Regions:
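Transmembrane helix boundary and interhelical loop/hinge segments in multi-pass membrane proteins
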Residues: 9, 152-174
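Extracytoplasmic/periplasmic domains immediately adjacent to an N-terminal transmembrane anchor
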Residues: 1-137, 328-366
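Short helix-capping/hinge motifs at transmembrane helix termini and TM-loop junctions
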Residues: 30-37, 156, 160-161, 204-212, ...
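Alpha-helical transmembrane segments and their short interhelical loops
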Residues: 178, 182-252, 256, 301-308, ...
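Membrane-interfacial helix-loop-helix junctions in multi-pass membrane proteins
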Residues: 74, 128-132, 211, 263-318, ...
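Transmembrane helix segments
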Residues: 25-40, 242-281, 285
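Long, hydrophobic alpha-helical segments
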Residues: 138-156
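Transmembrane helix-loop junction
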Residues: 157, 161, 174, 205-206, ...
Length: 366
């Protein structure tokens, strides 16, 4: 029995690969990404003494990317809304004011800790999340996590079940483009995901008092684009999975990095550079930027152009890949359908002369 199970495991290469790859993946993630301490933050210094004050900041922690003596506090708030920097220090007043982006929870905690050691020379003001509530940061990210679950796991399982029941074979004989079939298949899941998004957003506001400071249209547009990406990913997973179990395994393998490396749990700024770049390849990373930006900071579409552009590119790539794979799945059934149709037509054509000959023979006998 033991030998038989080992043989079965050796034949199931996908499960074997998961057993080997998953521990390695978890080791890398928790070794290089499981870090809540942000060691460097982007800072801007504005106001009349901007240049002089910037020189006094500890360079090991503050990466001063902007020094503008002519800017004021209004400009500082706009820079934080655009997430150009994590903190803007406004000089020309006593004490000096530091506006901190509270939507970046762990970075803002580190900034406040460092500035509190200045001996009262700097007064801190936390914007967008004044009490540094974890729920305010997590709820916008959880919306994306739920959409990811629906798009990858639920969609892939639903489509694989159709293959197991033979429904896809019926689609193969229909004159429908693969892209049209995919759009028809993902439409119900798109609707379910949209309803869940509305429910979670509403409950987040009612239960946790999470603000919604931005434009609703920008938020809905970002959610729709992200949902399109993860639904395409779910279709792609279904095309490389033969059974429901394989679909669940593959979808979970795709979901785990998105949970841990998207910045939802561990801050991207605290990750090792190599692991951080993996995070930048994940769709949930960019939806989290959009949802937190719109809900907490009131960010505009113009300031969120990068995550929107990346999600658009991902949607094109993922949907194209899913269409190509889906076309390959339908191709054998369509070839079989055309192959059986041609002999039937030839038999009908052959039956015509035979029937005519039989009729003429009957006429001569009469």
């Amino acid at each position: 029995m033991i030998v038989k199970e080992f043989r079965e495991l050796r034949r199931d290469k996908r499960t074997l690969a998961m057993l080997i790859a998953m521990p390695l993946l978890l080791l890398v993630i928790f070794g290089y990404a499981a870090n809540f301490e942000v060691k460097t933050v982007k800072a801007a210094v504005v106001g009349p003494q901007a240049t002089a004050f910037a020189a006094t900041l500890p360079s090991s922690f503050f990466n001063v990317t902007v020094i503008r003596p002519s800017d004021n506090q209004g400009d500082a708030v706009r820079m934080l809304q655009d997430r150009t920097v994590n903190v803007v220090i406004v000089t020309g007043r006593k004490p000096v004011l530091a506006d901190v982006d509270g939507s970046n929870l762990f970075a803002s905690q580190s900034i406040v800790s460092v500035l509190n050691k200045s001996g009262g020379k700097v007064s801190t003001q936390i914007l967008f999340n004044p009490e540094l509530k974890t729920s305010w940061v997590m709820v916008p990210a959880i919306i994306g996590l739920i959409l990811t679950f629906i798009g990858t796991i639920v969609t892939s399982i639903g489509l694989v079940r159709e293959r197991e029941t033979g429904t896809l074979e019926q689609l193969a004989v229909m004159p429908i483009k693969p892209s049209t079939v995919i759009l028809g298949k993902i439409s119900p899941y798109f609707l379910v995901g949209s309803i869940d998004m509305i429910i979670i957003t509403t409950l987040g506001r009612l239960l946790f008092d999470v603000p919604f400071n931005g434009n609703l249209f920008v938020f809905v547009l970002g959610a729709a684009l992200f949902l399109f990406v993860v639904l395409g990913l779910g279709v792609f997973i279904s095309t490389i999975s033969q059974t429901t179990g394989q679909a669940i395994q593959t979808a979970f393998f795709f979901m785990l990095p998105q949970i841990l490396l998207s910045g939802m749990i561990f801050p991207l700024d605290a990750m090792a550079a190599g692991v951080r770049w993996i995070g930048y390849l994940l769709p949930l990373t960019y939806f989290t930027m959009i949802s937190q930006g719109v809900m907490l900071r009131g960010a505009s579409l113009a300031s969120l152009w990068l995550p929107f552009a990346v999600l658009t590119l991902m949607a094109i790539v993922v949907f194209s890949g899913a269409t190509v794979r889906f076309r390959r799945d339908l191709a054998p059934g369509r070839r079989h359908h055309h192959g059986t149709a041609k002999p039937a037509a030839s038999e009908t054509a052959a039956a015509g002369p035979a029937a005519g000959a039989a009729g003429s023979e009957a006429g001569s006998l009469s």
